[in-house]
Amino acid sequence: MGGQACAVATGPGAGAAARDQAAVAGIRTVLTTQTAAWNRGDIPGFMQGYWKSDSLVFIGRRGPTYGWQQTLDNYRKGYPDAATMGQLDFSGLRISLLAPNAAQVVGRWHLARPSAGDVQGHFLLVMRQVGGQWVVAADHTNSE
C-alpha cells in the first residue's frame, strides 16, 4: 500500500473530518497487520482482525460460514502450511465509511505461492468498530 495524503480540515466539519481520517487510518492498520501476520504464517494473528463473535460471517466459494472459530478452523484447513499460505498482498483498496462505527472495504487480494501456484481475487469487507477497535464483521471473498 502506498503513501497516504493527509488533509487537515478546519471549521464546523473539522471534527467529523478528523474522525473520518482516524477511522480510515485504523482500518488500514488492521489490514496491514493482517497482511503481516499472514505473511509470517500466523493464521491466529491474521484472525485478530476479525470480529471475535458468532455473528461474524465469511462468504467464500462454499457459501457462508458463521462465527469466528469456524472461520479460523476453515482457514487452518485450507492453508495447512506456509507454502500453501504464500505471501498476501492487498491492492486497489477503496474504504467507504458508512457510519462513525461502520465501513466497507473493497479490494483485490493476491497470494504469491511459488510452489503451489498463485491465486487472486476480490473482496468486500464490512468493518465495525467494536470496543474501540476496527474489526471485520463480514467478509465476502472470491477467487478468479
Predicted regions and their residues:
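Short, low-complexity N-terminal intrinsically disordered segments enriched in polar/charged residues
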Residues: 5-49, 70
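A solvent-exposed, acidic/Ser-Thr-rich amphipathic alpha-helical stretch
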Residues: 43-98, 118
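Solvent-exposed loop/turn segments at secondary-structure junctions
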Residues: 56, 63-65, 111-112, 142-144
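Hydrophobic/aromatic beta-strand elements that line small-molecule binding cavities or substrate pockets
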Residues: 75, 91-96, 108-111, 122-128
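A short hydrophobic beta-strand element
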Residues: 101-109
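Short beta-strand edge/turn micro-motifs at domain boundaries
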Residues: 118-144
